[in-house]
From Swiss-Prot:
It is found in: Cytoplasm. GO terms for biological process: mRNA processing; mRNA stabilization; negative regulation of nuclear-transcribed mRNA poly(A) tail shortening; positive regulation of nuclear-transcribed mRNA catabolic process, deadenylation-dependent decay; positive regulation of nuclear-transcribed mRNA poly(A) tail shortening; regulation of translation; regulatory ncRNA-mediated gene silencing; translation. This is Polyadenylate-binding protein 1-B. GO terms for molecular function: eukaryotic initiation factor 4G binding; mRNA 3'-UTR binding; poly(A) binding; poly(U) RNA binding. CDD domains: RRM1_I_PABPs (cd12378), RRM2_I_PABPs (cd12379), RRM3_I_PABPs (cd12380), RRM4_I_PABPs (cd12381). Residues 452-473 are annotated as: Disordered. The C-terminus self-associates, interacts with dazl and interacts with the C-terminus of epabp independently of RNA. RRM 1 and RRM 2 interact with both eif4g1 and paip1, and the C-terminus also interacts with paip1. Interaction with eif4g1 is necessary for translation of mRNAs required for oocyte maturation. Interacts with the translation termination factor sup35/erf3. RRM4, together with the C- and N-terminal regions, is sufficient for RNA-binding. RRM 1 has no RNA-binding activity itself, but improves discrimination between poly(A) and poly(U) in combination with the other repeats. PANTHER family: RNA BINDING PROTEIN. Its main location: cytoplasm. Binds the poly(A) tail of mRNA. Prevents mRNA deadenylation and confers poly(A) stability. Stimulates the translation of mRNAs to which it is bound, acting, at least in part, with dazl. It holds the Pfam family MLLE.
Length: 633
């Protein structure tokens, strides 16, 4: 092992073939014995947060990374051997093909480790992979050497050798473009002809009689089933390309025993699949172009609306080519599609029908989107929402998911005493002391899914810790000043804090008229709030608009969430955490109104439940589709 390793100035490793349940903590436990680690990141899907099956581990020293690569490659984590290689951030080096070789006709028992052990004798290997599907090895793989010389040595020595009693082919890796160019050149000089659609009464002799007139045939074969019956297709291999070409030109489309036969160049399975895929994509693109701007998506349909009623409602706006209500088990799914003959008619229908009440429900009408467009739009909305919600704060917002990377702190983090308490204990936790959290980082592996964390003591830091007043949530000028000017030294005195607060402008917040309160005068002592409308939740102190305005922005949502959670839990105990997180995206003034108005709160909760149920139904449908292999529209 060479600690200097001039080829790898970075100490970053790629870890692939991970089990879906592997986390950053597991990888840290696995790789930390090799040396100090800077960070670990398991790559996840942006929306579902499911693992993509690979991760990056960044060491402080290249020598430690190389030690991990040499000693831990193909080690088993959660029942799966992991594949480790250097993280190559320059895609041109990965795609250049220099030092990369291709091996085929591998025995099914040969895995990544066996292939690595076999070829490591020829030089330093950057990556090694046997291509697999759900049934195991597909019989071929790739080995990427550090140098082209090592790759050439491996080709010279291993091509044609026996591996597990099978003769393997080892050659230079060729890109798809190179392979397609070679296939195209070979296709022009074909000698093998494919014939189909000639019925069950055809045999080898009769097929040779039909095609022998075009030239010398090396072989003729009619494919048969287990009972010896013709399967309706076969092959004729000619000695010369000219004879094969003439047979295709003359015989394709001719009647043979009353059937029009197909005669063409014989293709390999991969080539045929590629051609069919290209044709399918072209048809799909043509269909998208044809229906662009004329196909409408209609939802919130009454259960009694069928295809005829849907067509009747939209007929006044133009010529309809199709109208369909989507059904399941004979019942309407509540949405459908209407296709017009021109974009102008479709636009008019959207303008007139969107929001119109048909039967008992207001319709939602919009241009239909493809699944890919819809997912891209939802992803964009999600990212914008996350960008607007997240604020720079050393303490993680308890209603947001934890960070996706695992960072190693320079000092051991203080033990986090914050936990997920049942709602009944929230009131007991409120009078607990609160400390400045500057510089502290909460433990990255708290289970935050589907739960909200009540206010709890935060990890101490190196600044002077000082509990606030025992009067809950009534903030003095001293508290406001300290909140807005957190530093790593001792806190300013009461007089200094009061002077500072007099200079700084307190942010103004707008609330609905029903919950607006007169501004309190700030002084240096905690005081009891004046008489004003307050939200009362059993077991918690009243919440007023002025109390909310006095709190730092990052704490306002937490204060509202702690009061919303028990109310929502009384309606939907199992979904309370998720619904609370969804409602907290609403403006604070509306949340205060919902706390005062049970009817408004119940309405919003019902909407959130409907969204969750629709999302769960969609996920279940996608699982069924992926299990059955039936493509969705």
């Amino acid at each position: 092992m060479n600690p200097s390793a001039p080829s790898y100035p970075m100490a970053s490793l790629y870890v692939g073939d991970l089990h879906p349940d592997v986390t950053e903590a597991m990888l840290y436990e696995k790789f930390s014995p090799a040396g100090p680690i800077l960070s670990i990141r398991v790559c996840r899907d942006m929306i579902t947060r499911r693992s993509l099956g690979y991760a990056y581990v960044n060491f402080q020293q290249p020598a430690d990374a190389e030690r991990a690569l040499d000693t831990m490659n193909f080690d088993v984590i959660k029942g799966k051997p992991v594949r480790i290689m250097w993280s190559q951030r320059d895609p041109s080096l990965r795609k250049s093909g220099v030092g990369n070789i291709f091996i085929k006709n591998l025995d099914k028992s040969i895995d990544n480790k066996a292939l690595y052990d076999t070829f490591s004798a020829f030089g330093n290997i950057l990556s090694c992979k046997v291509v697999c599907d759900e049934n195991g090895s597909k019989g071929y793989g790739f080995v990427h050497f550090e140098t082209q010389e090592a790759a050439e040595r491996a080709i010279d020595k291993m091509n044609g050798m026996l591996l597990n009693d099978r003769k393997v082919f080892v050659g230079r890796f060729k890109s798809r473009k190179e392979r397609e160019a070679e296939l195209g050149a070979r296709a022009k000089e074909f000698t093998n002809v494919y014939i189909k659609n000639f019925g069950e009464d055809m045999d080898d002799e009769r097929l040779k009689e039909w095609f022998g007139q075009y030239g010398a045939a090396l072989s003729v074969k009619v494919m048969t089933d287990d009972h010896g019956k013709s399967r309706g297709f076969g092959f004729v291999s000619f000695e010369r390309h000219e004879d094969a070409q003439k047979a295709v030109d003359d015989m394709n489309g001719k009647d043979l025993n009353g059937k029009a036969i197909f005669v063409g160049r014989a293709q390999k399975k991969v080539e045929r699949q590629t051609e069919l895929k290209r044709k399918f994509e072209q048809m799909k693109q043509d269909r998208i172009t044809r229906y662009q701007g004329v196909n409408l998506y209609v939802k919130n349909l009454d259960d009694g609306i069928d295809d005829e009623r849907l067509r009747k409602e939209f007929t006044p706006f133009g010529s309809i080519t199709s109208a369909k209500v989507m059904m399941e088990g004979g019942r309407s799914k509540g949405f459908g599609f209407v296709c017009f003959s021109s974009p102008e008619e479709a636009t008019k229908a959207v303008t007139e029908m969107n929001g119109r009440i048909v039967a008992t429900k207001p319709l939602y009408v919009a241009l239909a989107q493809r699944k890919e467009e819809r997912q891209a739009h939802l992803t964009n909305q999600y990212m914008q929402r996350m960008a607007s919600v997240r604020v720079p704060n050393p303490v993680i917002n308890p209603y947001q998911p934890p960070p996706s990377s695992y960072f190693m702190a320079a000092i051991p983090p203080a033990q986090n005493r914050a936990a997920y308490y049942p709602p009944g204990q929230i009131a007991q936790l409120r009078p607990s002391p609160r400390w400045t959290a500057q510089g502290a980082r909460p433990h990255p592996f708290q289970n935050m899914a589907g739960a909200i964390r009540p206010s709890a003591p935060r990890p101490p830091t190196f600044s002077t810790m000082r509990p606030t007043s025992q009067v809950p949530r009534v903030m003095s000028a001293q508290r406001v000043a300290n909140t807005s000017t957190q530093t790593m030294g001792p806190r300013p005195t009461t007089a200094a804090a009061a002077a500072t607060s007099a200079v700084r402008t307190v942010p103004q917040y707008k609330y609905a008229a029903g919950v607006r309160n007169t501004q309190q005068h700030l002084n240096t002592q905690p005081q009891v709030a004046m008489q004003q409308p307050a939200v009362h939740v059993q077991g918690q102190e009243p919440l007023t608009a002025s109390m909310l305005a006095a709190a730092p922005p990052q704490e306002q949502k937490q204060m509202l969430g702690e009061r919303l959670f028990p109310l929502i839990q009384a309606m939907h105990p199992t979904l309370a955490g998720k619904i609370t997180g969804m409602l907290l995206e609403i403006d604070n003034s509306e949340l205060l109104h919902m706390l005062e108005s049970p009817e408004s709160l119940r309405s919003k909760v019902d909407e959130a439940v409907a969204v969750l149920q629709a999302h769960q139904a969609k996920e279940a449908a996608q699982k069924v589709v992926s299990a059955t292999g039936v493509p969705t529209a």
